[in-house]
């Protein structure tokens, strides 16, 4: 499935000439809304009467909103049939126990972080947290990207999986 996800991300980037999730959401005619009354809910994706919607908590930091947009776009591309039954809600974005959440995280990491950016960090012998600062995303998303790159043959050694509850703090 990981190869399918990477292929889907690459197809979108090629077709629309961007990796910006907001631009892709617009190009794909998905309705994007922000709301301030979501509490701890980061965002959600749903389908209603054949219309697709992404809702993002606008109390999040700008970079986190970008991440949620990429994550929810992943649900659109990978899990539309699930969203027709019930909205896909994201309280804990980096949940490793749910297959749909895991796949949406892989999608977001592949969309938002370029292989070349990680490769440059590795070449410059940056440590993990320096790498996260350079690419501009939280360590958990970077870990998803690193796992994907490892599976594609990059010489990366990771000691552990992401903590699924870090956003609850």
What are these regions (language model features)?
Residues 1-169:
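Active-site hotspot residues in diverse enzymes, especially metal/ion-binding acidic/histidine motifs
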């Amino acid at each position: 499935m990981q190869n399918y996800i990477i292929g889907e991300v690459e197809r979108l980037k090629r077709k629309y000439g961007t990796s910006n999730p907001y631009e892709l959401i617009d190009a794909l005619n998905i309705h994007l809304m922000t709301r301030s009354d979501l509490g701890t809910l980061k965002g959600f994706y749903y389908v209603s009467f054949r219309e697709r919607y992404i809702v993002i908590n606008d109390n999040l930091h700008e970079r986190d909103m970008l991440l949620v947009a990429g994550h929810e776009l992943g649900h659109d591309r990978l899990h539309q049939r699930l969203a027709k039954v019930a909205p896909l809600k994201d309280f804990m974005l980096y949940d490793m126990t749910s297959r749909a959440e895991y796949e949406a995280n892989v999608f977001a990491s592949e969309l938002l972080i370029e292989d070349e950016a990680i490769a440059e960090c590795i070449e410059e012998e940056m440590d993990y947290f320096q790498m996260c600062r350079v690419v501009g995303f939280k360590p958990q998303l970077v870990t998803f990207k690193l796992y994907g790159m490892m599976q594609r043959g990059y010489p990366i050694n990771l000691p552990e999986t992401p903590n699924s509850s870090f956003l609850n703090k």
